[in-house]
Protein backbone atom coordinates (compact mmCIF):
# COMPACT_ATOMS: atom_id res chain seq x y z
CA UNK A 1 0.00 0.00 0.00
CA UNK A 2 1.47 3.31 -1.09
CA UNK A 3 0.73 6.64 0.47
CA UNK A 4 0.76 9.28 -2.22
CA UNK A 5 1.06 12.48 -0.33
CA UNK A 6 0.58 14.12 3.02
CA UNK A 7 -2.61 16.11 2.52
CA UNK A 8 -6.26 15.31 1.98
CA UNK A 9 -5.30 13.19 -1.02
CA UNK A 10 -3.55 10.63 1.19
CA UNK A 11 -5.20 7.28 0.59
CA UNK A 12 -4.31 3.58 0.30
CA UNK A 13 -3.35 2.13 -3.05
CA UNK A 14 -6.35 0.70 -4.88
CA UNK A 15 -6.20 -2.52 -6.86
CA UNK A 16 -8.79 -4.28 -9.01
CA UNK A 17 -9.73 -6.34 -5.97
CA UNK A 18 -10.14 -3.28 -3.76
CA UNK A 19 -7.92 -1.83 -1.07
CA UNK A 20 -4.57 -3.57 -0.80
CA UNK A 21 -3.80 -4.13 2.86
CA UNK A 22 -1.35 -6.70 4.24
CA UNK A 23 1.57 -6.86 1.79
CA UNK A 24 4.19 -9.53 1.21
CA UNK A 25 7.86 -9.03 2.02
CA UNK A 26 8.77 -9.07 -1.69
CA UNK A 27 6.34 -6.20 -2.38
CA UNK A 28 7.72 -4.22 0.56
CA UNK A 29 11.29 -4.73 -0.71
CA UNK A 30 10.24 -3.52 -4.16
CA UNK A 31 8.54 -0.40 -2.79
CA UNK A 32 11.49 0.44 -0.53
CA UNK A 33 13.87 0.17 -3.49
CA UNK A 34 11.67 2.66 -5.34
CA UNK A 35 11.79 4.90 -2.24
CA UNK A 36 8.01 5.27 -2.20
CA UNK A 37 6.84 7.78 0.41
CA UNK A 38 5.49 5.34 3.01
CA UNK A 39 4.92 6.93 6.40
CA UNK A 40 3.30 4.49 8.86
CA UNK A 41 4.46 0.88 9.09
CA UNK A 42 3.74 -2.20 11.16
CA UNK A 43 6.49 -4.80 10.64
CA UNK A 44 6.26 -8.09 12.50
CA UNK A 45 6.98 -11.81 12.24
CA UNK A 46 9.54 -14.48 12.97
CA UNK A 47 11.91 -13.83 10.04
CA UNK A 48 13.83 -11.16 11.94
CA UNK A 49 16.74 -10.95 9.48
CA UNK A 50 14.56 -9.70 6.62
CA UNK A 51 12.54 -7.52 8.98
CA UNK A 52 15.63 -5.76 10.30
CA UNK A 53 16.92 -5.34 6.73
CA UNK A 54 13.67 -3.62 5.75
CA UNK A 55 13.91 -1.40 8.81
CA UNK A 56 17.44 -0.38 7.77
CA UNK A 57 16.19 0.51 4.27
CA UNK A 58 13.40 2.66 5.68
CA UNK A 59 15.95 4.48 7.85
CA UNK A 60 18.23 4.93 4.86
CA UNK A 61 15.37 6.34 2.77
CA UNK A 62 14.53 8.71 5.61
CA UNK A 63 17.99 10.29 5.55
CA UNK A 64 20.14 11.83 8.27
CA UNK A 65 19.01 11.15 11.84
CA UNK A 66 20.11 12.60 15.17
CA UNK A 67 19.01 10.62 18.19
CA UNK A 68 16.65 12.61 20.38
CA UNK A 69 16.09 15.29 17.74
CA UNK A 70 14.61 13.69 14.63
CA UNK A 71 14.99 10.05 15.67
CA UNK A 72 13.32 8.44 18.68
CA UNK A 73 12.93 4.80 19.77
CA UNK A 74 10.14 3.81 22.16
CA UNK A 75 9.52 0.49 23.93
CA UNK A 76 6.79 -1.17 25.98
CA UNK A 77 7.76 0.77 29.11
CA UNK A 78 7.33 4.20 27.49
CA UNK A 79 5.00 3.65 24.52
CA UNK A 80 2.45 5.93 26.23
CA UNK A 81 4.76 8.81 25.20
CA UNK A 82 4.14 8.17 21.50
CA UNK A 83 1.57 10.92 20.93
CA UNK A 84 3.78 13.42 22.72
CA UNK A 85 6.73 12.43 20.50
CA UNK A 86 4.62 12.79 17.35
CA UNK A 87 3.55 16.28 18.38
CA UNK A 88 7.04 17.41 19.44
CA UNK A 89 8.74 19.12 16.45
CA UNK A 90 12.01 17.77 15.08
CA UNK A 91 13.85 21.08 15.45
CA UNK A 92 15.78 21.89 12.28
CA UNK A 93 14.29 18.96 10.34
CA UNK A 94 11.13 18.47 8.29
CA UNK A 95 10.19 15.13 9.82
CA UNK A 96 10.90 12.84 12.74
CA UNK A 97 11.56 9.08 12.52
CA UNK A 98 9.85 7.24 15.37
CA UNK A 99 10.47 3.51 15.90
CA UNK A 100 8.27 1.70 18.43
CA UNK A 101 9.79 -1.68 19.34
CA UNK A 102 8.25 -4.65 21.15
CA UNK A 103 5.46 -2.50 22.55
CA UNK A 104 3.01 -5.42 22.82
CA UNK A 105 0.17 -3.07 21.87
CA UNK A 106 -0.87 -5.23 18.92
CA UNK A 107 -2.64 -7.81 21.03
CA UNK A 108 -6.34 -8.33 21.48
CA UNK A 109 -8.01 -7.99 24.88
CA UNK A 110 -7.07 -10.34 27.69
CA UNK A 111 -3.65 -12.01 27.83
CA UNK A 112 -2.91 -10.21 31.09
CA UNK A 113 -3.09 -6.69 29.64
CA UNK A 114 -3.83 -4.05 32.23
CA UNK A 115 -6.65 -1.55 31.93
CA UNK A 116 -3.98 1.15 31.57
CA UNK A 117 -2.45 -0.67 28.58
CA UNK A 118 -5.89 -1.03 26.97
CA UNK A 119 -6.44 2.70 27.38
CA UNK A 120 -3.04 3.45 25.82
CA UNK A 121 -3.88 1.31 22.78
CA UNK A 122 -7.27 2.99 22.41
CA UNK A 123 -5.74 6.45 22.73
CA UNK A 124 -3.00 5.77 20.12
CA UNK A 125 -5.50 4.18 17.74
CA UNK A 126 -7.93 7.10 17.95
CA UNK A 127 -5.13 9.63 17.58
CA UNK A 128 -3.74 8.02 14.41
CA UNK A 129 -7.22 7.69 12.87
CA UNK A 130 -8.27 11.24 13.66
CA UNK A 131 -4.94 12.96 12.92
CA UNK A 132 -3.53 10.78 10.17
CA UNK A 133 -2.71 13.61 7.78
CA UNK A 134 -0.88 15.47 10.54
CA UNK A 135 1.05 12.31 11.45
CA UNK A 136 2.25 11.71 7.88
CA UNK A 137 3.20 15.38 7.53
CA UNK A 138 5.47 15.29 10.57
CA UNK A 139 6.66 11.69 11.05
CA UNK A 140 7.68 8.38 9.66
CA UNK A 141 6.26 5.98 12.23
CA UNK A 142 7.39 2.34 12.41
CA UNK A 143 6.02 -0.29 14.78
CA UNK A 144 8.29 -3.36 15.06
CA UNK A 145 6.82 -6.38 16.84
CA UNK A 146 7.57 -10.06 17.27
CA UNK A 147 3.87 -10.91 17.05
CA UNK A 148 0.82 -8.88 16.10
CA UNK A 149 -2.86 -9.69 16.35
CA UNK A 150 -5.72 -7.94 14.59
CA UNK A 151 -6.83 -5.47 17.22
CA UNK A 152 -8.20 -1.97 16.49
CA UNK A 153 -4.76 -0.41 16.08
CA UNK A 154 -3.64 -3.17 13.68
CA UNK A 155 -6.76 -2.62 11.56
CA UNK A 156 -6.20 1.14 11.49
CA UNK A 157 -2.62 0.82 10.24
CA UNK A 158 -3.63 -1.90 7.80
CA UNK A 159 -6.22 0.48 6.33
CA UNK A 160 -4.12 3.66 6.28
CA UNK A 161 -0.50 2.56 6.24
CA UNK A 162 1.61 -0.52 5.51
CA UNK A 163 1.45 -3.83 7.37
CA UNK A 164 3.95 -6.59 6.55
CA UNK A 165 4.18 -9.99 8.22
CA UNK A 166 7.69 -11.43 7.87
CA UNK A 167 6.78 -15.10 7.89
CA UNK A 168 9.43 -17.79 8.03
CA UNK A 169 10.69 -18.38 4.49
CA UNK A 170 9.93 -21.65 2.74
CA UNK A 171 12.79 -23.88 1.62
CA UNK A 172 12.61 -22.76 -2.03
CA UNK A 173 12.72 -19.10 -0.92
CA UNK A 174 15.72 -19.73 1.34
CA UNK A 175 17.38 -21.63 -1.49
CA UNK A 176 16.84 -18.76 -3.95
CA UNK A 177 18.21 -16.13 -1.55
CA UNK A 178 21.34 -18.15 -0.71
CA UNK A 179 21.93 -18.88 -4.41
CA UNK A 180 21.62 -15.16 -5.15
CA UNK A 181 24.20 -14.31 -2.49
CA UNK A 182 26.62 -16.91 -3.89
CA UNK A 183 26.21 -15.60 -7.45
CA UNK A 184 26.89 -12.07 -6.26
CA UNK A 185 30.34 -13.25 -5.10
CA UNK A 186 30.85 -15.33 -8.29
CA UNK A 187 30.77 -18.59 -6.33
CA UNK A 188 28.84 -21.65 -7.54
CA UNK A 189 26.70 -23.92 -5.34
CA UNK A 190 24.10 -26.43 -6.49
CA UNK A 191 20.48 -26.30 -5.37
CA UNK A 192 20.87 -29.72 -3.73
CA UNK A 193 23.87 -28.55 -1.72
CA UNK A 194 22.00 -25.44 -0.58
CA UNK A 195 19.19 -27.70 0.63
CA UNK A 196 21.79 -29.82 2.43
CA UNK A 197 23.13 -26.68 4.11
CA UNK A 198 19.60 -25.76 5.24
CA UNK A 199 19.00 -29.27 6.59
CA UNK A 200 22.18 -29.05 8.64
CA UNK A 201 22.17 -25.42 9.76
CA UNK A 202 18.44 -24.79 10.14
CA UNK A 203 16.06 -22.31 8.55
CA UNK A 204 17.02 -19.15 10.44
CA UNK A 205 18.05 -16.67 7.75
CA UNK A 206 20.71 -14.94 9.85
CA UNK A 207 22.38 -18.27 10.69
CA UNK A 208 22.31 -19.30 7.03
CA UNK A 209 23.78 -15.97 5.91
CA UNK A 210 26.66 -16.48 8.36
CA UNK A 211 27.28 -20.01 7.06
CA UNK A 212 27.09 -19.15 3.35
CA UNK A 213 29.51 -16.25 3.84
CA UNK A 214 31.94 -18.62 5.52
CA UNK A 215 31.65 -21.04 2.59
CA UNK A 216 31.99 -18.25 0.00
CA UNK A 217 35.17 -16.99 1.63
CA UNK A 218 36.58 -20.53 1.64
CA UNK A 219 35.67 -21.24 -2.01
CA UNK A 220 36.90 -17.87 -3.30
CA UNK A 221 35.81 -16.04 -6.45
CA UNK A 222 35.23 -18.49 -9.29
CA UNK A 223 35.13 -21.42 -6.86
CA UNK A 224 32.43 -23.98 -6.11
CA UNK A 225 30.95 -24.89 -2.74
CA UNK A 226 30.59 -28.65 -2.33
CA UNK A 227 28.85 -30.93 0.16
CA UNK A 228 32.14 -31.84 1.81
CA UNK A 229 32.86 -28.13 2.38
CA UNK A 230 29.55 -27.82 4.24
CA UNK A 231 30.44 -30.86 6.37
CA UNK A 232 33.89 -29.46 7.13
CA UNK A 233 33.07 -25.79 7.78
CA UNK A 234 29.47 -25.36 8.86
CA UNK A 235 27.96 -25.66 12.31
CA UNK A 236 25.35 -28.38 12.53
CA UNK A 237 22.29 -27.68 14.64
CA UNK A 238 21.71 -30.25 17.35
CA UNK A 239 18.55 -31.39 15.54
CA UNK A 240 20.61 -32.26 12.45
CA UNK A 241 23.13 -34.12 14.62
CA UNK A 242 20.31 -36.05 16.29
CA UNK A 243 19.07 -37.09 12.83
CA UNK A 244 22.58 -38.42 12.08
CA UNK A 245 22.69 -40.23 15.41
CA UNK A 246 19.26 -41.79 14.87
CA UNK A 247 20.21 -42.86 11.33
CA UNK A 248 23.18 -44.77 12.69
CA UNK A 249 21.23 -46.25 15.59
CA UNK A 250 18.56 -47.45 13.15
CA UNK A 251 21.22 -49.04 10.95
CA UNK A 252 22.82 -50.65 14.06
CA UNK A 253 26.02 -48.69 13.43
CA UNK A 254 26.98 -48.57 17.10
CA UNK A 255 30.55 -47.30 16.60
CA UNK A 256 29.41 -44.37 14.46
CA UNK A 257 26.59 -43.62 16.91
CA UNK A 258 29.03 -43.45 19.82
CA UNK A 259 31.36 -41.23 17.79
CA UNK A 260 28.52 -38.76 17.10
CA UNK A 261 27.59 -38.79 20.78
CA UNK A 262 31.23 -38.18 21.75
CA UNK A 263 31.37 -35.23 19.34
CA UNK A 264 28.25 -33.75 20.90
CA UNK A 265 29.76 -34.02 24.37
CA UNK A 266 33.07 -32.63 23.11
CA UNK A 267 31.21 -29.60 21.74
CA UNK A 268 29.98 -29.08 25.32
CA UNK A 269 26.33 -29.81 24.62
CA UNK A 270 24.79 -30.59 28.05
CA UNK A 271 23.89 -34.26 28.48
CA UNK A 272 20.42 -33.29 29.70
CA UNK A 273 19.80 -31.30 26.50
CA UNK A 274 21.01 -34.23 24.37
CA UNK A 275 18.70 -36.67 26.18
CA UNK A 276 15.68 -34.34 25.96
CA UNK A 277 16.31 -33.72 22.24
CA UNK A 278 16.65 -37.47 21.64
CA UNK A 279 13.45 -38.16 23.56
CA UNK A 280 11.52 -35.55 21.56
CA UNK A 281 12.97 -36.91 18.31
CA UNK A 282 11.88 -40.49 19.03
CA UNK A 283 8.49 -39.19 20.13
CA UNK A 284 8.13 -37.62 16.67
CA UNK A 285 9.14 -40.90 15.03
CA UNK A 286 6.40 -42.64 17.03
CA UNK A 287 3.85 -40.01 15.96
CA UNK A 288 5.01 -40.51 12.36
CA UNK A 289 4.48 -44.28 12.64
CA UNK A 290 0.95 -43.81 14.00
CA UNK A 291 0.17 -41.23 11.30
CA UNK A 292 1.30 -43.66 8.59
CA UNK A 293 -0.80 -46.47 10.08
CA UNK A 294 -3.89 -44.28 10.26
CA UNK A 295 -3.24 -42.63 6.88
CA UNK A 296 -2.99 -39.17 8.43
CA UNK A 297 -0.99 -36.19 7.20
CA UNK A 298 2.47 -36.43 8.80
CA UNK A 299 3.22 -32.71 8.60
CA UNK A 300 -0.05 -31.89 10.37
CA UNK A 301 0.49 -34.62 12.98
CA UNK A 302 3.97 -33.26 13.75
CA UNK A 303 2.78 -29.64 13.58
CA UNK A 304 5.54 -28.77 11.09
CA UNK A 305 5.94 -25.23 9.78
CA UNK A 306 5.91 -24.53 6.02
CA UNK A 307 9.71 -24.30 5.98
CA UNK A 308 10.03 -27.70 7.71
CA UNK A 309 8.15 -29.83 5.16
CA UNK A 310 11.40 -31.44 4.00
CA UNK A 311 11.55 -33.18 7.39
CA UNK A 312 8.56 -35.43 6.62
CA UNK A 313 10.64 -37.65 4.34
CA UNK A 314 13.41 -37.92 6.93
CA UNK A 315 10.97 -38.80 9.73
CA UNK A 316 9.31 -41.45 7.55
CA UNK A 317 12.65 -43.00 6.67
CA UNK A 318 13.89 -43.07 10.25
CA UNK A 319 10.59 -44.36 11.65
CA UNK A 320 10.95 -47.37 9.35
CA UNK A 321 14.15 -48.39 11.19
CA UNK A 322 12.27 -49.13 14.40
CA UNK A 323 9.30 -51.20 15.53
CA UNK A 324 6.32 -49.31 16.92
CA UNK A 325 6.84 -50.91 20.34
CA UNK A 326 10.47 -49.75 20.39
CA UNK A 327 9.46 -46.17 19.68
CA UNK A 328 6.61 -46.24 22.20
CA UNK A 329 8.90 -47.51 24.96
CA UNK A 330 11.80 -45.15 24.21
Where are these regions (language model features)?
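Non-catalytic interfacial helical region
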Residues: 20-29, 33-34, 38-41, 46-244
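Intrinsic, low-complexity polybasic segments
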Residues: 6-7
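Amphipathic alpha-helical segments within well-ordered protein domains
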Residues: 179, 198, 215-216, 246, ...
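Hydrophobic/aromatic-lined pockets within catalytic cores
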Residues: 220, 250, 265
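Short helix-adjacent coil turns
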Residues: 237, 245, 249-256
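Short, Lys/Arg-enriched N-terminal segments with co-localized hydrophobic residues
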Residues: 12-20
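Helix-rich C-terminal "collar"/helical-bundle subdomain used as an assembly and partner-interaction module
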Residues: 21-26, 33-46, 81, 88, ...
Amino acid sequence: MILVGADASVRPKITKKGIKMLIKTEQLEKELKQNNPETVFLLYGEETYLLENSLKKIKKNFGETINGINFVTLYENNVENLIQEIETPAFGYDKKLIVVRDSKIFQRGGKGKSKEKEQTIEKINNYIKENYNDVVNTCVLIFVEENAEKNKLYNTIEKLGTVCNFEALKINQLNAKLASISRAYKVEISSNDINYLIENSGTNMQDLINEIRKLIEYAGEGGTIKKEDIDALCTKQIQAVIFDLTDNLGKKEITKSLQILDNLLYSKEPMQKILITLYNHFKKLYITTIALEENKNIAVSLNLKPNQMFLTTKYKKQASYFKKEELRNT
